[in-house]
Amino acid sequence: MPEETQVHVVRHGEVHNPTGILYGRLPGFHLSATGAAQAAAVADALADRDIVAVIASPLQRAQETAAPIAARHDLAVETDPDLIESANFFXGRRVGPGDGAWRDPRVWWQLRNPFTPSWGEPYVDIAARMTTAVDKARVRGAGHEVVCVSHQLPVWTLRLYLTGKRLWHDPRRRDCALASVTSLIYDGDRLVDVVYSQPAAL
């Protein structure tokens, strides 16, 4: 009889980013005080779950989000590079409306194709590595629950892929808030449900 396994894919908490840059994979970006509180709220929400492993992206903000979750279950945080943030040409720049990056003609070529996208890691590659990460976690925690801490675009791309939706999308419409939990519920190796929650929401 197939076992039920749950993989809880958590987005990291709020990051201390006073200059408002797109930090991507850059080192040194840690959780803000709010982000630490969000991570603690997720740890509280998952405290009574049957969690046997906590696995995180190698980036600091993901490791810091994973730490209180792992501590609640007397586990060490494990690291999986497949959970890392997506690569992005604009990492290290301000890219909001009216900011310099968009007004620089030298970068316009990077914006030519929103479907791949041309400015970063292809969606299909993100989906492939995130699926690999989740499959490893599911096998590792068969019959139990596992937490994987990652980043907004990888988590959202994974969800689109697993639910059979197109991968290109409007970033403003991602249903993946800070410190949110996307729970993947498996019957054996078959995905039977996806449940989204925001335990850290105010």
From Swiss-Prot:
Position(s), cross-link Isoglutamyl lysine isopeptide (Lys-Gln) (interchain with Q-Cter in protein Pup): K136
InterPro entries the record matches: His_Pase_superF_clade-1 (IPR013078), His_PPase_superfam (IPR029033), PGM_Phosphatase (IPR050275)
SUPFAM superfamilies found in the cross-reference section: Phosphoglycerate mutase-like
Residues of the signal peptide: none
Molecular function GO labels: phosphatase activity
Keywords: Isopeptide bond, Ubl conjugation
Name of the protein: Uncharacterized protein MT0547
Organism per entry: Mycobacterium tuberculosis (strain CDC 1551 / Oshkosh)
